[in-house]
C-alpha cells in the first residue's frame, strides 16, 4: 500500500532521500486520503494534479529540537510542458504548498511531524477498515 510505504520511509531516521514514483491517479488518491484541502494550481491547465507532478514531503529539524514537515506539490508550468523546456535552477518548476484539513501550520508554514505521521496512520487505518470488496476497487 502506497500510504504505508510513504509512512515507513518517513519514519526512518537515517534516510536522507526517498523517491517513489506513480501516476496522477496515485497522487490524487494520496491527497484525498491525507485530507488535503481543496486547491487550484496556478500556471497549470490541469489545476489539481498536472502531468509529471510530484508530492514532496520534507522533514525538518527545528531549533527547538522538534521535527517538522512540509508538503508541497511540484509541477511544471503549462508553458514549460508545451515548450518542452528543461527544468533548471534558472527555469524551476512550480512549488505549491499543500494544506491538510484540521491541522495547523506554524509561522514557518510547517506542520509538527508527529501530526503528519498521525494523519498517515489515520488514513492507513481507514483503508484497513474498508470491506475487502472496496479495497479491491481502490
Regions found by a protein language model. Give the residues of each.
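Non-catalytic terminal regions with compositionally biased, polar/charged low complexity
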Residues: 1-138
